[in-house]
Amino acid sequence: MIHEIKMNEIYCMDNLELLKKMKSNSVDLIYCDILYNTGRKFKDYDDRLGTPQEAIEWYRPRLIEMKRILRSTGNVVLHCDYHINSYIRVAMDEIFGIKNFRNEIVWKRSNDTGSSKAKGNKLPVCSDTLVWYSATDKYTFIMPTIPYDSKLMNRFKYDDNDGKGKYYWADLRTYSEKRLNELRDNNELKVRSSGKYSYKRYLNTANTNKALSNIWDDINRLSSNSSESCDYFSQKPKALLQRITNMLSNEGDVVADFFMGSGTSIVVAKELGRQYIGCDINPRAVEITNKRLNDIKIGG
C-alpha cells in the first residue's frame, strides 16, 4: 500500500487511487494521453469504457482530482481524438471552468490519408486533439516558435561580402529623417523607380522564427523503425512532448502523467530538468518507462 507519494517515482496502480493520495496544489503540468474509448482492445491496453456517458462518468472523479492537485499557475493537457474530445471538453468546462479553457490543439500526426481509390463514406482521420486548460488565469505559458519556411529564408540572397551577412531589399514603410540618414550613410538604402524606399534587411538581425498556431503539422507520429520506438501501441514522439513541456512548464516544475503508457512524457520531463510523477495500471508500461529513465544520460 502506498502511504506517501514521492517525487520522481513511477507507480503501477489505478490512477484514481494515486490521485486521491496526492497533495493539493502540488503539480505544475499534467499531460495525459487518455483512453479514447474507441471500443477496441489493443495489445497494451483496453480502450473500452462503454457509452460516451459511461466514459465521462469514469473520467469525472479523475478530472476533479486533477483540478485539486494542480497549482494555481498549472496547466493540464488531455490528448485524445474525435471519439471523446467533445465529451471531454464539456466535462472540463464544468470542472475547470469555461474561462480556463485555453486551446484545442490539432496535432496532424500523419500525412498519409490512404489510397485515393479506397472506398469509404467519410474522410480519413490523420489528427489527434490536445485539450488544454489552466487552473487559473495566472498560468505558465512560454510561446513556442518555429522557423519560417524556406520560401522566406530564400529571400536573403544578397551578400556584399562586407561582413554584414546575407540580406534582401525590404520595403521601408515608416521612417524618420534620422533613420533615412543612417541607412544612407551605411549604404543600406535605395530609392525605387516608384520613389519609395527599400532597405537592406539582414538575416542576422531578422526574426527568423514565427509563433506557433494551434495546428501542429510539423511533428510526425513514430514509425515502427524509429530509434525512439519501444514497441508500445500509440507511443507518442518525444518532439511532441518536448514542445508541450517547454510551452507550459519551467525547469524544476512537477510534471505528472496518469496514463503514462510508454512514458514519453516522463522521459522528456527528466531530460528537460523537471520533476515527475508517472502512473499506469499496466506493469509493462511501468517496466518500459523505468528502463527508458535508466537509459537517460543527463548532460551526456
Q: Model-flagged regions — what are they?
A:
Residues 1-290, 294-298:
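Core catalytic lobe of class I
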